[in-house]
Amino acid sequence: METKTVKYINVNGKLMDLSHPQVMGILNVTPDSFYAGSRQQTEKDIINRTSQIIEEGASIIDIGAYSSRPNAEHISPEEEMRRLRTGLEIINRYHPGCVVSVDTFRADVARMCVEEYGVAIINDIAAGEMDPQMFDMVARLGVPYIIMHMQGTPQNMQMNPHYDNLLKEVFLYFSEKVQKLRDLGVKDIILDPGFGFGKTVEHNYQLMNHLEEFSLFELPLLVGISRKSMIYKLLGGTPDDALNGTTVLDTISLLKGADILRVHDVKAAVETVKIVQKMKNSAAF
């Protein structure tokens, strides 16, 4: 029988058990996310989307106000905060007590979300690279912190990404980040390999092929491949056509040790988790 490190994160003073994979539902309060179906701008849109995420079984809502798609428009911290306030006020009004993560690379934005709205997790696509104050802020706030690997920035990350040794470079990146965070006293660190961020389609599949090797860190692993170009560039079509491919890769990710799936399509992901867990539990007998 396969043994696996039991992983927990401290969420608002309660332990979230990751021995059963969790689903994180995406709430984009942006006008320019790469997947048009995920853009929520009006109050009614946000209310409907947050209700859908919860009703379909996600345990975390990931709210983001800064589009990280390739060549995304850069917005000011003030505009990012304005968009987030709108979404967080609605979440707290209609779904108090639900677990919320904020997708931001800015320390001041993270502080506002945690201190003013009770956000439980910080999800940083830049792992501190785009704001030198972020690591210190995370240590001060004492919340779980998701660090993602990205080569470059959202504005330039897909301009001919290159690696001499993809896996070695990604692992070294995480090793250095984790050590710095540990030195600052950060306890709950979650790794995100960063599919689609500064990587070609081939890079993404190489990374997926070695996903189980991230278990060496003995840290929770988040995978976000929902409707990304690594799917529709291979199969043809657009993000609208990429749900089946997403489900296939989510399944592979779970079999290779993913603890959290970050997705647009919550119901499909929850069902995927349920089936994979059933298979794993049946194999134990």
What are these regions (language model features)?
Residues 25-28, 124:
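Redox-cofactor binding/interface segments in oxidoreductases and associated redox assembly factors
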Residues 11-12, 18, 35-52, 68-93, ...:
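Active-site-adjacent loop and "lid" segments of alpha/beta metabolic enzymes
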Residues 1-19:
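N-terminal carbohydrate-binding accessory modules
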Residues 18-26, 54-64:
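N-terminal glycine-rich anion-binding loops that anchor highly charged ligand groups
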Residues 31-33:
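Enzymes and membrane/adaptor proteins characterized by extended Gly/Ser/Thr/Asp/Glu-rich
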Residues 194:
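Conserved Motif II region of HX4D acyltransferases
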